[in-house]
Curated annotation (Swiss-Prot):
InterPro entries assigned: Polyoma_agno
Topology with respect to the bilayer: Single-pass type II membrane protein
Residue intervals annotated with topology Cytoplasmic: 1-23
GO MF annotations, alphabetized: channel activity; DNA binding
BP-aspect Gene Ontology terms: monoatomic ion transmembrane transport
Changes after translation: Phosphorylated by host kinase. Phosphorylation segregates agnoprotein in cytoplasm, whereas unphosphorylated agnoprotein migrate to the nucleus.
Organism: Simian virus 40
Stretches that traverse the bilayer: 24-40
Functional description taken from the UniProt entry: Alters the structure of the nuclear envelope by interacting with host CBX5 and disrupting CBX5 association with LBR. Involved in the perinuclear-nuclear localization of the capsid protein VP1 during virion assembly and maturation. Plays an important role in the release of progeny virions from infected cells and in viral propagation, probably by acting as a viral ionic channel in the host plasma membrane. Allows influx of extracellular calcium ions in the host cell. May contribute to viral genome transcription and translation of viral late proteins.
Protein name (record): Agnoprotein
Family: Belongs to the polyomaviruses agnoprotein family.
């Protein structure tokens, strides 16, 4: 009887900690995705202004 109760309490604690871990992991994942999106869009995080798009190859001026 006592062992059964302790087992149930332990499983509830594990479920709670797993739920908290999932929420933390989701928040971290969303943060990384937002950071990657800002980087891909070329937004400068220092002053919040967007940089002009840069070309990988320069066009020859005519």
């Amino acid at each position: 009887m006592v062992l059964r109760r302790l087992s149930r309490q332990a499983s509830v604690k594990v479920r709670r900690s797993w739920t908290e871990s999932k929420k933390t992991a989701q928040r971290l994942f969303v943060f990384v995705l937002e950071l990657l999106l800002q980087f891909c869009e070329g937004e400068d995080t220092v002053d919040g202004k967007r940089k002009k798009p840069e070309r990988l190859t320069e066009k020859p001026e005519s």
